[in-house]
Design a protein with these regions (language model features):
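A conserved catalytic-core segment of Leloir-type glycosyltransferases
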Residues: 1-32
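Carbohydrate-associated surface elements
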Residues: 120, 142
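Membrane-proximal helix-turn-helix segments that form the acceptor-binding/catalytic region
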Residues: 36-37, 74, 91-114
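Nucleotide-activated donor-binding/catalytic signature segment of Leloir-type glycosyltransferases, i.e.
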Residues: 203-228
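Glycosyltransferase donor-sugar binding loop
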Residues: 164-165, 190-206, 222
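Conserved donor-binding/catalytic core segment of Leloir-type glycosyltransferases
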Residues: 154-172, 178-181, 194
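Active-site proximal beta-strand in glycosyltransferases
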Residues: 46-48, 60-86, 90
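Short N-terminal targeting/anchoring amphipathic segment
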Residues: 37-56, 65-67
Length: 229
């Protein structure tokens, strides 16, 4: 796609070469492109940025009411990945990928309005991003109760548990559930855990399941519709 694109600009080249050396440039280039787009579009009432925390958000904030969504501070992801990574090569790659955090650490304290989904995240944002608590507004995640509601037609299966994992990284907390299954399986041999998510082949979750010897007690489901969930 890069080589086929005509009229490449600085962000295109920056994105391409930073990705080549193992970085994650999209946070920065997204902000630059958003700023360029909004410079000729003044009809918007406000702007919501979903955690890019790019330098351009400082400028956009001067032109529009800006709401900065931070689900959780990504320095925690880096912290956990480095903790569980094995080998200097893997750790070097992780540090390179998270290099955009230098930018986010500078931008976050300058945001006027930050939205967080929980008090726990709010506390972490203050801790890791050094943001004034008065700038952070907690708005809990919502759920569509027209879709996700009790279904009386489906009977409950004893000892069957369901959980979700949006990414195969220790931060998501699936480790604790898997270790709990390992403890409970002796007392409840029919226990079964269904994980809505996809583990990386040979990744952290697969290795832990193999180490605990609970393959027969855990299964994964992916690409489900809302109704199937």
């Amino acid at each position: 796609l890069f080589f086929n694109k005509k009229n490449k600009d600085f962000d295109d080249f920056y994105e391409f070469f930073i990705a080549l050396i193992g970085g994650f440039p999209e946070m920065r280039t997204f902000g630059n492109r958003a700023k360029k787009y909004l410079s000729t579009r003044k009809e918007y009432d406000f702007v919501i940025d979903n955690q890019s925390l790019s330098y351009s958000m400082i400028k956009i904030q001067e032109e529009f009411p800006l709401f900065q969504v931070i689900h959780h501070p990504i320095p925690r992801d880096k912290e956990y990945e480095l903790k569980y990574a094995k080998g200097i090569v893997k750790k070097t790659f992780i540090r390179s990928w998270y290099s955009f955090l230098k930018m986010q650490l500078k931008v976050a304290p300058k945001m006027h309005n930050i939205i967080s989904p929980s008090e726990s995240s709010k506390n972490d944002i203050q801790k890791y991003f050094h943001v004034d608590a008065n700038k952070i507004h907690v708005i809990p995640n919502g759920i569509d109760t027209e879709i996700f509601k009790p279904n009386l037609v489906i009977s409950k299966k004893p000892f069957k548990l369901i959980t979700t994992a949006s990414a195969d990284v220790p931060l998501k907390g699936l480790d604790f559930t898997l270790r709990a299954i390992n403890i409970a399986k002796d007392k409840y041999p029919l226990i079964n855990l269904v994980v809505i998510g996809k583990p990386r082949s040979g990744g952290h979750t697969e290795r832990l399941i193999s180490k605990l010897g609970i393959d027969e007690f855990v299964s994964f489901k992916t690409n489900l519709t809302n109704q199937e969930v």
